[in-house]
Amino acid sequence: MTIEDSECRQRQIVIEKYTDEELGLEFEAAVFDGVTTCYNNCVFCFVDQMIPGMRESLYVRDDDYRLSFLYGNFITLTNMKEEDFEQIIKTHMSPLYISVHATRPEVRCQMMNNRFAGELMSKINRLVEAGISIHTQIVCCPGYNDGEVLEQTYRDLEALAPMVETMAVVPVGITKHREHLTPMRLFSKPEAAAIVCLLYTSPSPR
C-alpha cells in the first residue's frame, strides 16, 4: 500500500494477513477526492421532496460508481467519463447498481431531464461485455414508464441475463413537499395491479 503524509512524502507499507482476516484499517471517507453528485433533474427525485432541517448527508444526491460498488448505491451512468469506464473494467468493479427507469431513450431523457440519459443501453452493454454484473432499479411513474414502456424495459434487461441479475420495480413515492416540481401522482389500485400482473406473467430471466 502506498501512503502519503501531510508533507506529500510517499512510502510503501506491506500488510500481512490471512485471507479471512479484516485489513485492520479504517478510512475517514470512502473516497478521497469528493463524492460525484447527480446533475439530473428527475421528475420523481425523492431528495427534492424532502423536508428541510434534516441532517445534511440526506440531501446529497450521490451518483458515484465507486459508492455503487462499495455500498450498493444506485447510479445513473449519465456523468460517467471514459476513464471511469476504463477503471471499472480494469479493476473489475462488479457488481454495480444502476438506475434504469426506462430503456426507451426518449422516455429516460424525459424522466431525467437530461438529453444524454438515452445512451443507457450502450453503456450497460459495454459493462456486461466486460464481465460486470448489474443490479437494476426502475422508479415507476404513471404515464411515463409504465405499460408498454415498462414491458420493453423488462424485455431489454431480461435479454442481458444472467449478467443483469435483478430488476427492482419501485412505485414512485410522493411527499407533500412538491412545490414547483413536475406534477406527479400515485398509481391507482387497478394501475398497480396491472403492473404486478405484467411483471408476474412475463417470462422469468434466464
Model segments located where?
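Conserved Radical SAM active-site core
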Residues: 8-10, 17-163, 173-198
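Alpha/beta-hydrolase-fold catalytic nucleophile elbow
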Residues: 170
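Conserved small/polar residues in nucleotide/adenosyl-binding loops
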Residues: 200-205
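A generic structural motif
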Residues: 4-6
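Conserved PDZ fold ligand-binding element
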Residues: 1
